[in-house]
A protein has these predicted regions:
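N-terminal secretory signal peptides and thylakoid transit peptides that target proteins
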Residues: 2-18
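A bilobed periplasmic-binding-protein/Venus flytrap-type ligand-binding module shared by bacterial periplasmic
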Residues: 155-160, 201-205, 276-288, 306-307
Length: 359
């Protein structure tokens, strides 16, 4: 894995330090979109046949994304298994390693793809279109490529926040430890969702990798948590329906839901974490040409623009502007998130968290 850069060096390597300063952007601390290059590559062999795609993207993205790929790649049919819990898809791919059932894994934090790559369950592939992706947002071992950034925030049911917790938005993660939140919070399961784990890792990095302090935080946070839903979209829905007051969750998914329900709101505390959403080809694919063509298309400007339009995610490409009002890596204050360390210590931290909170 590549060595972790400090936040300013990382932004500089991605080409956005100057832009951030010029725009008066907020915190530092993350990778940013890469300089875009030319059009989508042409496959050596014409893709055809059928592929199966395991998707951790949400419903608002999946169907239109697949339809757009099929329109751009005549002759390829796509069977889609949508399951907005990347951890469950990772487990499924591992269980099927002797006889793979899917060709492509799309969505979810890169740590899920990274784990599969280390287990030898992903094909080595660097798409020609990956030249538009900065090296900090793709696997140096060529197992996966990032195509979007997700920023972690908090979804709130505005009516219940006003009535039950005083109406003020949380400005720090520590605000969620106040006893007034007891029984009112939920969090996507850290075991099955990338967001849940990134929430834990964010606390570790907030405390400069002092795991004792981070686990003390998670224990106190757990005291205010009513449940841990299996998917991040499910947690947003429960807050949107008014069943719970708030949930740490993905900013882009919160903004997408807010279009349907203006009664929710987004807060982004200082020192937040982020994900690099990835795409990869599964080892043993029966249709490698079409599977690689899918990855090629996902990395195009066209796909990046569609992803932003459908989901409010931030594209890794600099030639794809963010959605209006969507937070970006330079408009929020990010924690110094050591992605390599988080991936390498994921299993251990999850076990430590389970021991700490008694789950």
């Amino acid at each position: 894995m590549t060595p972790q850069l400090d936040r300013r060096s990382f932004l500089k390597a991605m080409g956005i330090v100057t832009a951030a300063a010029a725009c008066g952007g907020g915190g530092a601390g993350a990778p940013a979109p890469a300089t875009a290059t030319g059009a989508a590559p042409t496959a050596a062999a014409k893709p055809s046949g059928r592929i199966s795609v395991y998707s951790a993207l949400n419903e608002s993205t999946n169907n239109q994304f697949v339809a757009a790929f099929k329109a751009a790649t005549p002759g390829v049919e796509v069977d889609l298994l949508p399951l907005a819990a990347a951890g469950e898809l990772q487990t499924r791919i591992k269980a099927e390693k002797a006889s793979p059932k899917a060709d492509v894994f799309i969505g979810g934090d890169s740590s899920f793809h990274d784990g599969l790559g280390k287990d030898g369950l992903l094909e080595t592939y660097e798409s020609p279109a990956a030249s538009a992706v900065a090296k900090e947002s793709k696997d140096p071992n060529r197992n996966w490529t990032g195509f979007y950034f997700g920023i972690f925030g908090i979804v709130m049911n505005t009516d219940r926040v006003n009535k039950e917790v005083g109406g003020a938005k949380p400005t720090s993660w520590d605000d969620l430890l106040d006893p007034k939140w007891k029984g009112k919070l939920i969090l996507g399961s850290p075991i099955t969702t990338g967001g849940g784990y990134i929430f834990i890792a964010t606390q570790v990095f907030r405390f400069n990798k002092d795991e004792a302090k981070a686990m003390d935080y998670m224990k106190r946070f757990h005291a205010n948590v009513a449940q841990y839903p299996g998917t991040s979209p499910q947690a947003i829905q429960l807050v949107s329906q008014g069943q719970f007051v708030a949930a740490p969750n993905w900013a882009h998914d919160i903004l997408t839901e807010k279009v349907k329900n203006p009664g929710i709101d987004l807060a982004i505390p200082k020192g937040t974490g982020y994900e690099i959403g990835a795409v990869s080809v599964i080892k043993g694919t029966k249709n490698p040409v079409a599977a690689k063509a899918f990855v090629d298309w996902v990395l195009t400007k066209e796909a990046g623009e569609l992803n932003v339009k459908l989901s409010n995610r931030v594209s890794v490409r600099t030639d794809v502007p963010p959605a209006p009002g969507a937070p970006t890596l330079t408009s929020v204050e990010l924690v110094n998130y050591d992605r390599d360390w988080a991936a390498a210590n994921k299993d251990r931290l999850l076990k430590l968290w389970q021991q700490t909170v008694g789950i």
